[in-house]
């Protein structure tokens, strides 16, 4: 038995009305021959009449060889191994759900295959003893794998081929599925020309940093007055964005009391490693400029 090939799910064949991910192999007069990627590449066919609800002018525009597509199962002949599928009966919601499920299943497959190849165990054995029992219990093995990082009880009742296999699996799951923090950034211009202007700005920015929680620290850095950068890191991107939105609201509330203003020049958003590196370089450059200006002022006072 193979250490790298196995269907993703316990059923050898999909059921009628199941939404499946396929890869187009060949286009013929009758329709398109496809492989069902989640079922160890068993063959299926999308009949020409099931490609589109509209009149077909060019098959190539509807379906292309080598491309992955989402289809719904119409008929299954388990004895002959025939599977008829439809593309035209698939809704946009079906596509989203299928793609999400397929990505989760691919991740589980990749993790199990790693262990199968390392210990030279048939991949199907790992599915039978680990993934499929977890799927029955948790809906999908992917959800069980993620939960297992913080809850060891997930493995109760699971009988792996050996303790070494389970230990390696746990270790690899932790490496692959532990969430990585996302950096969130926003840019604001804060100004106040009243008598208490400088103190007002300090109070407003401090109020933003006071919005920090144990999980998400809000930091404020000066770029060049009146421009300031707010940053935080969060495991959940949306929560991080909401955290900075609340911090900006607090800045606006405080600075307004002093007669100042806060303008958002870049709303909160997740930033890439490249964007973050560019920001750090800019902040370091400004810091060097400030030091240089300070040293020049000291030299001038010494000359006097």
UniProtKB/Swiss-Prot annotation:
One GO BP: formation of translation preinitiation complex
InterPro entries, alphabetized: NA-bd_OB-fold, S1_domain, S1_IF2_alpha, TIF2_asu_C, TIF2_asu_middle_sf, TIF_2_asu
Q: Where is the S1 motif domain?
A: 17-88
Q: Which GO terms describe its cellular component?
A: cytoplasm; cytoplasmic stress granule; cytosol; eukaryotic 48S preinitiation complex; eukaryotic translation initiation factor 2 complex; multi-eIF complex; ribosome
Acidic residues bias: start-end ranges: 294-304
Region (Disordered) residue ranges read: 283-304
Single Gene Ontology MF annotation: translation initiation factor activity
Output compositional bias ranges, type Basic and acidic residues: 284-293
Q: What is its main location?
A: cytoplasm
Chain positions with Phosphoserine modification:
52, 292, 294
Q: How is it modified after translation?
A: Phosphorylated; phosphorylation on Ser-52 by the GCN2 protein kinase occurs in response to low amino acid, carbon, or purine availability. Phosphorylation inhibits the guanine nucleotide exchange factor activity of the eIF2B complex.
Q: Where in the cell is it found?
A: Cytoplasm, Cytosol
Which domain of life does this protein belong to? Eukaryota
UniProt keywords (A-Z) are: Cytoplasm, Initiation factor, Phosphoprotein, Protein biosynthesis, RNA-binding
> Could you tell me which Gene3D superfamilies the record lists for this protein?
EIF_2_alpha, Nucleic acid-binding proteins, Translation initiation factor 2, subunit 1, domain 2
The Swiss-Prot or TrEMBL record describes its family as follows: Belongs to the eIF-2-alpha family.
According to its UniProt entry, what is the function of this protein?
A: eIF-2 functions in the early steps of protein synthesis by forming a ternary complex with GTP and initiator tRNA. This complex binds to a 40S ribosomal subunit, followed by mRNA binding to form a 43S pre-initiation complex. Junction of the 60S ribosomal subunit to form the 80S initiation complex is preceded by hydrolysis of the GTP bound to eIF-2 and release of an eIF-2-GDP binary complex. In order for eIF-2 to recycle and catalyze another round of initiation, the GDP bound to eIF-2 must exchange with GTP by way of a reaction catalyzed by eIF2B.
More details: Present with 17100 molecules/cell in log phase SD medium.
Subunit arrangement? Eukaryotic translation initiation factor 2 eIF2 is a heterotrimeric complex composed of an alpha, a beta and a gamma subunit. The factors eIF-1, eIF-2, eIF-3, TIF5/eIF-5 and methionyl-tRNAi form a multifactor complex (MFC) that may bind to the 40S ribosome. Interacts with CDC123; the interaction is direct. Interacts with GCD1.
Supply the name of the protein: Eukaryotic translation initiation factor 2 subunit alpha
To which species is this protein native?
Saccharomyces cerevisiae (strain ATCC 204508 / S288c)
The gene from which this protein is expressed is: SUI2
């Amino acid at each position: 038995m193979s250490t790298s090939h196995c269907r993703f799910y316990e059923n050898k064949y999909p059921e009628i009305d199941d939404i499946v991910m396929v890869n187009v192999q060949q286009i013929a007069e009758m329709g398109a021959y496809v492989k069902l990627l989640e079922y160890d590449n068993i063959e299926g066919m999308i009949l020409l009449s099931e490609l589109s609800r509209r009149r077909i002018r060019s098959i190539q525009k509807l379906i292309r060889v080598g491309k992955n597509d989402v289809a719904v199962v119409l008929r299954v002949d388990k004895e002959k191994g025939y599977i008829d599928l439809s593309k035209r009966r698939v809704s946009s919601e079906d596509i989203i759900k299928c793609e999400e499920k397929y990505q989760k299943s691919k991740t589980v497959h990749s993790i199990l295959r790693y262990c199968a190849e390392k210990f030279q165990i048939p991949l199907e054995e790992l599915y039978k003893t680990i993934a499929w029992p977890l799927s029955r219990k948790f809906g999908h093995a992917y959800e069980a794998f993620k939960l297992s990082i913080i809850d060891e009880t997930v493995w109760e009742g699971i009988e792996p081929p050996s303790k070494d296999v389970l230990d390696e699996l746990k270790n690899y799951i932790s490496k692959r599925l532990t969430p990585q923090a996302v950096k969130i950034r926003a840019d604001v211009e804060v100004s106040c020309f009243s008598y208490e202007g400088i103190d007002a700005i300090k109070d407003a920015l401090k109020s933003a940093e006071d919005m920090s929680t144990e999980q998400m620290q809000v930091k404020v850095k000066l770029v060049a007055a009146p421009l300031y950068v707010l940053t935080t890191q969060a495991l959940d991107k949306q929560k991080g964005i909401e955290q900075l939105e609340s911090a900006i609201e607090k800045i606006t509330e405080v600075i307004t009391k002093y007669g100042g203003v806060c303008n958002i020049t870049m709303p909160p958003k997740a930033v890439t490693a490249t964007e973050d590196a560019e920001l750090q370089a800019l902040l370091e450059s400004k810091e060097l400029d400030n030091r240089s200006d300070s040293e020049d002022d000291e030299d001038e006072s010494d000359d006097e």
